[in-house]
UniProtKB/Swiss-Prot annotation:
Main location: membrane
Keyword Chaperone annotated: no
Membrane association type: Multi-pass membrane protein
Top-level division of the source organism's lineage: Bacteria
Entry's Gene Ontology cellular component terms: plasma membrane
Record has Transmembrane helix as a keyword: yes
Family under the similarity heading: Belongs to the UPF0060 family.
UniProt xrefs under SUPFAM superfamilies: Multidrug resistance efflux transporter EmrE
Name by which UniProt lists this protein: UPF0060 membrane protein xcc-b100_1273
Subcellular location: Cell inner membrane
């Protein structure tokens, strides 16, 4: 598997872990879910933090680039979990963010 594809898949896994970790407390606080949802939420957020440590670039660069993938993944979440269809403007914005991620992560580096 190429380094670019590995990086992208790692970003997506990181985003899913963060989304799950934030969505479960939302279900508890806003939708009347069980307080027990906080346990898998905490585990998911711990996985999220661990996944961030697996990225092979400087942390600031990883966080900046990850934001673009998070936005695109959150829009998929909007569509699949919340059952709200993203608008073309949502998709255009996500495309711009993914382009930014690609520039940040895959541009040539000196030294």
């Amino acid at each position: 598997m190429s380094a670019a594809l590995t990086t992208l898949l790692l970003f997506v896994a990181t985003a899913v872990a963060e989304l799950v970790g934030c969505y479960l407390p939302y279900l508890w606080l806003r939708k009347g879910g069980s307080v027990w949802l906080l346990l898998p939420a905490a585990l998911s957020l711990a996985v999220f933090v661990w996944l961030l440590t697996l990225h092979p670039a400087a942390s600031g660069r990883v966080y900046a680039a990850y934001g673009g993938v998070y936005i695109a993944t959150a829009l998929l979440w909007l569509w699949w979990v919340d059952r709200v269809t993203p608008t073309r403007w949502d998709l255009l914005g996500a495309g711009c963010c993914l382009l930014g991620m690609a520039i940040i992560m895959f541009s040539p580096r000196s030294g």
